[in-house]
């Protein structure tokens, strides 16, 4: 049968198959099978058929890779299966600690250096891009989303369709009802260079690194812009329905991670070829060393290797913490360091008035980004470094994320260089800065300081507090600089016409922001309390206080008249009680609370919250006789907060580990205490596990 004798639906189906096969050969296999001129002619034929009869248009058509009209925004969508981040290890000791904990959890007794077939691992490169969740139904791509917060992400399907290495239809004869693939979108180094060259020619600011360029590209509202930047994609994770088995015509269902990578490749995905099956930690160390030395020869950016337990059933047994799988870890490359010439010391002011010194230096490329500023934390750190004008400093990107000054090359110090001192005047409002005795932080105590106001507003609208989408830092800066907002309450009095006149604020953005502000009025009381930004009151303490005191009025009364009621709250000490007393006794804050109430923000728990709290109070917690040791930095709790929680539940916190220690609570950069705990086989908890123990 010739092409002209086929019906339009038959010919369209044939063209889709031919073009998709050709695209897969070109973009994924790197083995072109069709001349460009032939591809273009067939593509045009398919496009003509679809234009004449829109019923022939299908989601897997290659014509759908280049989207149509720009989107108005991105909807938040739930992930079928949480898309979690990985825990990080920055050295071999941390890697070994992870492995020992995993082996112990699975009930194996083995030396980390001894090959154990049941516990083989897969080593993969950690691509420095952006994670995507791809959802397929009956083999057809129906949705693509960003990681987001792990539970929900932004739907960017139209943009992802433009990535040629992502199949719109899977190469399966009998696909399952649903299938989820996770992987990394990225921009190759050569493409990134071309993008920045073009931006420079247009007078646009260059992207700092390929990862930032990729993230910005994926959130473009116009898919045609995304298509022009030629993103690529490596698949690495697969989720299938329980008990689903492939039919004889399709690749056999994978039983381990090594087979998952092969299966993904067989059904049409591009899989990173630089993987290895690893039998023990010695093999992992060799794999890591290999790519640490060779990574700069790759055509894309990588910031470490990922190690995964190979057996999928053992992965399921190991399970997850709240934030990451227990069966995988990212081993990051050592932080990169480079020297640069110090230009000046400046300061930035936070929402509490704390002034953070910042070193500004000649821009240097570091870990894939251009860096010209680094935090110095506080005045004590500035004194320790003994910085002088013209110094050559050494800058490191810790974890390849946060730039920090780690030292000074004093042998290169210019003759007669003057010691640099921190300013004594607030750079924002020109008020005198204050440093209280015993504190490392210098503060601006002017409540009208624009920097404090900006920080206060950013905190109020943050995700942990009122979560007001659409009110970002740039808009807040405009509102403060124009004198339109002088307190949190002023946000709720903003008129639509005024907002629409702001830079980059159209009618739709304004409408969405007004809606988000109205919705924030009904957020839970504990989020409102946290959002007020009272010094020392974090998310954990705000929840505890909100349970005890169901309104701002009852909390204020206790803080000012009965502070012992405050310190009776689980995990709340004198420092927080004093901070609450000072805050509620301040007339400006009393005026703020009154305004918020007038604007419809209840500042009290609703019936659902009260019912939940009543149920929670029925439970009792007792750690009587249990001893704890804290080590490392926990994700959300300070060490004093964790200690207060443990002691309030009857437990005791010691400073050293012994055979009588019940638990060691370990955070990031845990040191010798964690090693000793593992030698003595003391149970090690992370923050999430500690909180579960306290709540059980």
Swiss-Prot record:
| This protein's GO CC annotations | cytosol
| Active site positions, chain numbering | 126
Q: Which SMART domains match?
A: BRCT, LIGANc
Q: Which residues form the BRCT domain?
A: 618-696
According to its UniProt entry, the protein's GO biological process terms are: DNA repair; DNA replication
Could you say which EC number(s) this protein's record lists? 6.5.1.2
| Catalytic reactions of this protein | NAD(+) + (deoxyribonucleotide)n-3'-hydroxyl + 5'-phospho-(deoxyribonucleotide)m = (deoxyribonucleotide)n+m + AMP + beta-nicotinamide D-nucleotide
Enumerate the transmembrane spans: none
Q: Provide the cofactor list for this protein.
A: Mg(2+); Mn(2+)
Residue positions binding NAD(+) = 36-40, 85-86, 124, 147, 184, 308, 332
Q: Which Pfam families match?
A: BRCT, DNA_ligase_aden, DNA_ligase_OB, DNA_ligase_ZBD, HHH_2, HHH_5
- Binding annotation for Zn(2+): 426, 429, 444, 449
What are the UniProt keywords, alphabetically?
DNA damage, DNA repair, DNA replication, Ligase, Magnesium, Manganese, Metal-binding, NAD, Zinc
Xref: InterPro entries: BRCT_dom (IPR001357), BRCT_dom_sf (IPR036420), DisA/LigA_HHH (IPR041663), DNA_ligase (IPR001679), DNAligase_adenylation (IPR013839), DNAligase_N (IPR013840), NA-bd_OB-fold (IPR012340), NAD_DNA_ligase_OB (IPR004150)
**Gene Ontology MF term list:** DNA ligase (NAD+) activity; metal ion binding
- The answer to whether keyword RNA-binding applies is no
Its top-level enzyme class, in one word, is ligase
Q: Which domain of life is it from?
A: Bacteria
The family assignment reads:
Belongs to the NAD-dependent DNA ligase family. LigA subfamily.
What is the role of this chain? Answer: DNA ligase that catalyzes the formation of phosphodiester linkages between 5'-phosphoryl and 3'-hydroxyl groups in double-stranded DNA using NAD as a coenzyme and as the energy source for the reaction. It is essential for DNA replication and repair of damaged DNA.
**HAMAP family in alphabetical order:** DNA_ligase_A (MF_01588)
The protein here is known as DNA ligase
| Organism field | Prochlorococcus marinus (strain MIT 9303)
Q: What is the lineage of its organism?
A: Bacteria, Bacillati, Cyanobacteriota, Cyanophyceae, Synechococcales
């Amino acid at each position: 049968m010739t092409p002209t004798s086929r019906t339009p639906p038959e010919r369209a189906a044939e063209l889709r198959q031919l073009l998709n096969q050709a695209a897969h050969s070109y973009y994924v296999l790197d083995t072109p099978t069709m001349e460009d001129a032939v591809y273009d002619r067939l593509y045009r034929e398919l496009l003509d058929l679809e234009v004449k009869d829109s019923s022939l248009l299908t989601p897997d058509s290659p014509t759908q890779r280049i989207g149509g009209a720009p989107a108005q925004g991105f909807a938040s969508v739930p992930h079928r299966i949480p898309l979690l981040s990985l825990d990080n290890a920055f050295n071999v000791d941390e890697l070994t600690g992870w492995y020992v904990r995993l082996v112990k959890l699975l009930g194996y007794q083995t030396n980390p250096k001894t090959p154990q077939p049941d516990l083989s691992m897969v080593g993969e490169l950690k691509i420095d891009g952006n994670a995507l969740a791809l959802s397929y139904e009956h083999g057809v791509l129906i949705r693509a989303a960003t990681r987001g917060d792990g539970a929900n992400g932004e739907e960017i399907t139209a943009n992802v369709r433009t990535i040629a290495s992502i199949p719109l239809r899977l190469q399966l004869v009998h696909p399952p009802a649903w299938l989820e693939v996770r992987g990394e979108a990225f921009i190759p180094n050569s493409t990134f260079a071309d993008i920045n060259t073009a931006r420079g020619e247009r007078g646009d600011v260059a992207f700092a690194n390929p990862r930032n360029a990729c993230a910005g590209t994926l959130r473009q509202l116009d898919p045609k812009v995304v298509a022009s930047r030629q993103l690529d994609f490596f698949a690495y994770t697969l989720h299938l329905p329980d008990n689903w088995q492939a039919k004889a015509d399709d690749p056999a269902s994978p039983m381990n991670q090594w087979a998952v990578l092969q299966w993904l490749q067989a059904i049409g995905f591009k899989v990173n070829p630089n993987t290895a099956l690893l039998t023990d930690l010695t093999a992992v160390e060799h794999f890591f060393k290999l790519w640490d030395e060779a990574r700069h020869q790759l055509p894309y950016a990588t910031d470490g290797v990922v190690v995964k337990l190979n057996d999928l059933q053992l992965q399921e047994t190991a399970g997850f913490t709240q934030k990451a799988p227990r069966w995988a870890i990212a081993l990051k490359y050592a932080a990169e360091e480079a020297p640069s010439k110090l230009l000046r010391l400046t300061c930035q002011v936070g929402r509490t008035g704390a002034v953070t010194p910042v070193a500004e230096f000649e821009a240097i490329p570091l870990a894939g980004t251009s860096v010209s500023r680094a935090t110095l934390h506080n005045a004590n750190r500035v004194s320790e470094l003994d910085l002088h004008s013209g110094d050559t400093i050494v800058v490191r990107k810790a974890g390849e994320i946060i730039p920090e000054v780690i030292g000074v090359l004093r042998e290169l110090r210019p003759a007669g260089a003057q010691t640099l001192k921190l300013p004594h005047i607030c750079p924002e409002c020109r008020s005198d800065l204050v440093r209280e005795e015993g504190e490392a932080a210098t503060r601006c105590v002017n409540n009208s300081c624009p920097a404090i106001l900006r920080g206060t507003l950013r905190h109020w609208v943050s995700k942990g507090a009122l979560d007001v989408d659409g009110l970002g830092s740039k808009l807040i800066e405009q509102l403060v600089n124009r004198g339109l907002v002088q307190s949190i309450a002023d946000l709720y009095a903003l008129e639509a016409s005024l907002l629409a006149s702001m830079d980059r604020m159209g009618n739709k953005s304004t409408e969405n922001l007004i809606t988000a502000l109205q919705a924030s009025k009904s957020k839970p009381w504990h989020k409102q309390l946290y959002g007020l930004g009272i010094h020392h009151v974090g998310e954990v303490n705000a929840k505890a206080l909100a349970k005890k005191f169901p309104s701002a009025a009852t909390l204020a009364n206790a803080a000012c008249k009965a502070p012992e009621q405050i310190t009776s709250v689980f995990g709340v000490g004198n420092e927080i009680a004093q901070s609450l007393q000072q805050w509620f006794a301040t007339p400006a804050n009393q005026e703020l609370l009154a305004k918020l109430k007038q604007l419809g923000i209840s500042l009290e728990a609703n019936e659902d919250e009260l019912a939940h709290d009543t149920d929670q109070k029925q439970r009792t917690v007792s750690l009587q006789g249990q001893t704890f040791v804290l080590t490392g930095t926990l994700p959300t709790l300070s060490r004093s907060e964790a200690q207060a929680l443990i002691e309030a539940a009857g437990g005791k916190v010691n400073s050293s580990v012994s055979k009588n220690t019940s638990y060691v609570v370990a955070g990031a950069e845990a040191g010798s205490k964690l090693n000793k705990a593992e030698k003595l086989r003391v149970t090690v908890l992370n923050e999430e596990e500690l909180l579960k123990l306290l709540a059980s």
